[in-house]
Amino acid sequence: MSKLKGPDGRVGDRLPDGRPAISWQRRWTEGALPLWLVATAGGTAVIFVLGIFFYGSYTGIGNAG
């Protein structure tokens, strides 16, 4: 078992000398779900929801014509 893991199994943020335990590159690309994948899915969902609002403003009850 690694010395870096805490009692709950998570890796600590810093080594004893103050350096980060995990580089920013690994924090960005590793884990249960990579952060870039979560950000991409979230951004796509936001664009989709905004698209629904814009579509609704030009069609249906709210349109000017």
UniProtKB/Swiss-Prot annotation:
The chain crosses the membrane at residues 35-55. GO terms for cellular component: photosystem II reaction center; plasma membrane-derived thylakoid membrane. Keywords: Membrane, Photosynthesis, Photosystem II, Reaction center, Thylakoid, Transmembrane, Transmembrane helix. It holds the Pfam family PsbJ. One of its GO terms (biological process) is photosynthesis. Signal peptide: none annotated. PSII is composed of 1 copy each of membrane proteins PsbA, PsbB, PsbC, PsbD, PsbE, PsbF, PsbH, PsbI, PsbJ, PsbK, PsbL, PsbM, PsbT, PsbX, PsbY, Psb30/Ycf12, peripheral proteins PsbO, CyanoQ (PsbQ), PsbU, PsbV and a large number of cofactors. It forms dimeric complexes. One of the components of the core complex of photosystem II (PSII). PSII is a light-driven water:plastoquinone oxidoreductase that uses light energy to abstract electrons from H(2)O, generating O(2) and a proton gradient subsequently used for ATP formation. It consists of a core antenna complex that captures photons, and an electron transfer chain that converts photonic excitation into a charge separation. Belongs to the PsbJ family. This is Photosystem II reaction center protein J. It comes from Prochlorococcus marinus (strain NATL1A). The lineage of its organism: Bacteria, Bacillati, Cyanobacteriota, Cyanophyceae, Synechococcales.
